C-alpha cells in the first residue's frame, strides 16, 4: 500500500482524494479554510457518483470487483485522509496542500491555518480509525511486512489519540 509512505495522504488513492478536496472545496475559498464536514460530504458524493457510473456498465467480474473492492475501500480511505489532515493541523497549526496548475502541473503550496470541525465530525473519523486497527480489517492486513504494519499502527493510534483529545 502507499505510493511512498504509510499514510493515506502518501498513497495514490489518498492523493487523488486530496486533489478532489483541493479542486472542489479549497480553491473555492482561496485556500483559507478546510471545512471537515464539507470535505467528508464531497468525498462521499464523489465516490458514490463513480460507483453509479460503474453500475451503468455491463456487468462483469472486473466491474464488480472494482466497485466492491476499490471504490468501496475509498470511503474508508476518505475518512482516514480527512483524519490525517486534521491530525497535521492539530500537530502543526496548519495543513500544507498543493494545487497543481498549468500545462506542466506546477505545484503551488498552500498553508491552511483555519479548520471548521465539530464534535459530530470527529465521531465517524474516530470510529473508522478504530475499525482499521482490527486484525481482520483489509487495511490492517494489506501491509507487506510486520515492521511496516507496526509503523502504520503507531501512526493510526497517534492520529486516533490526537483527534480524541479534541472531542
Can you say where each PLM-predicted feature lies in the sequence?
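Low-complexity intrinsically disordered segments
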Residues: 119-167
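Short amphipathic alpha-helical segments and their helix-coil junctions
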Residues: 27-70
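Helix-start/N-cap signature of alpha-helical segments
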Residues: 7-10, 32, 71-75
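Short, extreme N-terminal segment that most often corresponds to the first beta-strand
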Residues: 1-26
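Residue-level signature of the C-terminal ends
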Residues: 24, 89-92, 166
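Gly-Asp-aromatic-enriched flexible segments
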Residues: 11, 41-50, 75, 139, ...
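Amphipathic protein-protein interaction modules
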Residues: 74-140
